[in-house]
Amino acid sequence: MKNLVLCLAVVLSPLSMLSQSYDLVIQGGRVIDPETGLDAIRNVGISQGKIRKISAEALAGRRVISAQGLIVAPGFIDLHQHAVDLESQRLKALDGVTTALEMEIGKPDVAAFLQSMEGHSLINYGTTASHPAARSLAFGTPIPTNSLLPKSGTAAAEKPASPEQIEAMKARLRHELDAGALGVGMGLQYTPGVTRWEVIEMFRVAAERSLPVFTHVRSNGKLEPGSNIESVSEVIGAAAVTGAALQIVHINSSCGAQALDCLSLIAGARARGLAVTVEAYPYEAAMTYINSARFNPGWQEKSGATYHDLMLPETGERLTKERFDELHNSSEPRTIILFSNTMENVDLVFRNPLVMVASDGEKDHPRNAGTFCRILARYVRSQGTLTLMDAIRKMSLMPAQVLERSTPAARFKGRLQEGADADVVIFNLQTVTDRATYQHPQEPSQGVEYLLVGGAVLVEKGKLIEGTFPGKALVGEMKR
């Protein structure tokens, strides 16, 4: 009798697995988790927005998605996304992104931003506190409605701040951190009036809360003094003396041909215990505002670019000096695409293991729609310079680990493990690709077959499901 019971237990054990029914089961996909190194055919059980089971055994679910022949990975996390309109969110979802955050220069009113997005977001969202906005307020300058960046020639962009103005900025940033900001965002190239001391004082605000600083460095080209090397050294130094963690954004465009040298500085800082991280996007052209301080006199010598390297995104028009002067002096913010790098340089950047992926996404540039699928198509499938595991790590786990300095909620993102949030991308490695171009920047990527945000299916069979808004806010420590 004892042996019979034992035999029955062995025979029925697979059935016990099936007795647990999940809200949704992803069946038979190649499951990849960059933290544990899992790369195997598995079934994934999801309930109540969480991954509850990953098993080689069959699982039962009220809904089953067949993922045979497909990759099942953690949803991609974009730490550098400007556009938050619904169309941009759709493009992000079709690019495999489950979380997109405005971390570079932040939002001017964090509470208002979070309230405006609640219940209306396809994907997860969040923001830093904006130093450019705090600076504009300290100088009594209205914050531009179409851009947080102060216009070239204004006091908020060009003038050094008084001690009183620096204190006003710090108070504003603390207020925004209290409202749920995930750190401090700075755009130093757009505010050349910022002194080295002001930089350190802003880093101190982040360090008070053990939060990171995300910064666009001054990016002044190869010329000394003030080169890209000096720009990166400046913010690493501020991190060292204050203890704030630091994320340097889009090193591909900020440092150009000097990107590898700048990456060596970052590697050296990390080897000595500093929390310095870095991201990039896989395109040779940048995009910014033409009436910003980035185009102050001397910009051509610093960047190595010409007027003809500037293109209006809406028309494809290449600029002349006369057209540049007209647009630069306009009171209306206008975006411009700047062809100032090469894909050869960009490719080298992404081979570096320190570099994670972020889009710097904004309408009118293909990076808004295609960044993440482009990584898979270009570097994994076409060039073979990244393994699939490494590419997924750069797009999920690495940004999640940066976010862990801002919010414990990030510990459950960027992983495909039991207990993690069910933010999941399912894609076809043979067909996944970006389709957006400089001429047609709104073309969605293809190859993402399914996307889950918090367990809710947002993309099904390559099509966005309309009318569902599962995105949730990620907020800083002080808000919880």
Predicted regions and their residues:
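Active-site microenvironment of metallo-dependent hydrolases
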Residues: 4-7, 17-42, 47, 56, ...
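Divalent-metal coordination cores built from histidine and acidic residues
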Residues: 66-72, 86-185, 274
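Hydrophobic faces of well-ordered beta-strands that scaffold small-molecule active sites
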Residues: 75-81, 100-102, 125-129, 184-186, ...
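Active-site-adjacent beta->alpha loops and helix N-cap segments on the catalytic face
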Residues: 107-112, 193-202
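Alpha-helix-loop-beta-strand connector modules within alpha/beta enzyme cores
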Residues: 120-125, 200-215, 241
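Active-site neighborhoods of metal-dependent hydrolases
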Residues: 137-194, 236-240, 244-245, 249-388
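Charged helix-capping and loop-helix junction motifs
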Residues: 197-201, 229-234, 371
